[in-house]
Amino acid sequence: KRQRIAVPSARRVLRHMVSHLIVDARDRQLGKAIAALRDEHTRLNINLLGEAILGQGEADRRLEGIAALIRRDDVDYVSVKVSAATAPHAPYAFDEAVADITERLTPLFELARDRDTFINLDMEEYRDLDLTLNVFTALLEQPGLRDYEAGIVLQAYLPDALAAMVRLQEWAARRVAAGGAPVKVRVVKGANLPMERMQASLTGWPLATVGSKQEADTNYKRVLNYALTPEHLAHVRIGVAGHNLFDVALAHRLIERRGLDPAAVEFEMLPVSYTHLRAHE
């Protein structure tokens, strides 16, 4: 009996503690949260959180949960990771993994296209970098998705970030030249450094990310400097994602000095950071 009382109470306390970061995904509660957060200046990126996917049944449930979000009239932007699409894959079966995940994500992208909902292909661990890039391009090279604009996340704390941006830019330029839609790259610092450090320490491998916050900040600015030009924004819109106001100011200055189209650049941050920023305008 005590357990039946304690667990619901603990859930309520936990939800209250993280309410500025995470909203309740249950249908009625989510609708209220979206209505409270949205205003004329904002667009909400809804990311369905959950434990790591370990089996196909879990992957099916996660994808159905994301599809349910896309079907909502009050949702127009969602994120999904390649690791949510299928059970863990064998690293030596890379091509098969790309084909399998592309097949599983295609119905989700087609649903988003039909619902005019933006999908962002998110990234988590370094080992998913090439997989995510290849799945993203394979999805959007399909004839039915040629005119659909989707996005992908790029983590600046990866040493490969600038090279990956160049690769995406060159691919997007060919896509647009062939009559396809531009794409969007959401540039983030990266949020899994403790996990990457743990993985490196357990295996004895070199750290996959850069070694310090300063290096990550520098890499972030390298990516923005490359991406924020008229010729590059014609193919790849940019999401400047993060709560560092210096990075936001830098992006604004580059837009002004280079005469860029402000509509081609979006600024993304957590609700608590956005609310604080708006309060001090």
Segments predicted by a language model, with ranges:
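Conserved small/polar residues in nucleotide/adenosyl-binding loops
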Residues: T275-H280
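Aromatic-lined glycan-binding groove of carbohydrate-active enzymes
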Residues: G179-Q199
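Alpha/beta catalytic barrel-like cores
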Residues: K1-T117, N134, A138-G144, Y148-A150, ...
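Phosphate/diphosphate-binding loops
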Residues: G151-W171, V185, E281
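Active-site-proximal loop/turn and secondary-structure-junction residues that shape catalytic pockets
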Residues: L48-L54, V82-T86, M123-L129, L154-D160, ...
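Conserved, mostly hydrophobic/aromatic
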Residues: I46, L121, V240
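Long hydrophobic segments that form regular secondary structure
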Residues: E215-V265, M269-S273
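Interdomain boundary/hinge elements
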Residues: G144-L158, L260-M269
